[in-house]
Amino acid sequence: MAAKPAIIALFDVDGTLTAPRKEVTPEMLKFMKELRKVVPVGVVGGSDLTKISEQLGKTVINDYDYVFAENGLVAYKDGAEVAIMSLKKLLGEEKLKEFINFTLKYIAELDIPIKRGTFIEFRNGMINVSPIGRNCSQEERDEFEKYDKIQKVRSTMVSVLREKFGHFNLTFSIGGQISFDVFPRGWDKTYSLRYLEDFNEIHFFGDKTFEGGNDYEIFASERTVGHTVTSPEDTMKQCTEIFLTKKE
């Protein structure tokens, strides 16, 4: 019997393997292929598999040893689905409607420069909330991100929702440029770690590793060795130093 693999490299998607909401570059695909020859490689994203595939390619579940969509609530190993969890089943329809109705009313009364469409996206394991609306253009995304850094639209909204729905035991996690994720406590990216029990050392790479960011919980977990990256280029640089540079 082969010895169990000791180390795995686990990556966030947006801002880590790709620029925010952009497709992966050929350079990164080639780099991941080379890295996978040295260590098992996994990806964990807040988006569903469709959106992850749009960024990392249609063969993503075969290009990595593990793919965790929706923070690991939908899990794939060696190209096959191994588990799926449902937010609807956990919360129930009445609680979901209460949360969604309040959130839409809050956004309707929000005074921001522009609004587009798809303010709430219901996923299998989470709700994604975007004050500007997810179908805005890339230029509008960039502008909202700058505006939000000054006006704190998302963090203010999260504070209101956290107070209003504290009894729902929800976690609110700001990620990307225009939105934040809402999911049951414990259903953050650390959820994916239950599928990596065979590994002694889990190196996690992410860009939103600050408290409140959607990489924070897994970055800070005692189960992982956390690495903060600033771009896909920085990810490749750090991985080269850690995994691909021969130590004397």
Swiss-Prot record:
Cellular component, GO annotation: cytosol
Positions of alpha-D-mannose 1-phosphate binding: 21, 123, 134, 141, 179, 181
Domain of life: Eukaryota
Classification via InterPro entries: HAD-like_sf, HAD-SF_hydro_IIB, HAD_sf, PMM, PMM_cap
Chief location: cytoplasm
Binding site for Mg(2+) 2: 219, 224
Localization: Cytoplasm
Gene3D superfamilies with a match to the protein in the record: 3.30.1240.20, HAD superfamily/HAD-like
Enzyme Commission number, as recorded: 5.4.2.8
Catalytic machinery residues: 12, 14
Molecular function via GO: metal ion binding; phosphomannomutase activity
Any Gene Ontology biological process: GDP-mannose biosynthetic process
Keywords carried by this UniProt record: Cytoplasm, Isomerase, Magnesium, Metal-binding
Annotated binding of Mg(2+) 1, by residue: 12, 14, 207
Keyword Flavoprotein: no
Statement: the UniProt record of this protein carries the keyword Magnesium: yes
Family: Belongs to the eukaryotic PMM family.
PANTHER family: PHOSPHOMANNOMUTASE
Record's protein name: Phosphomannomutase
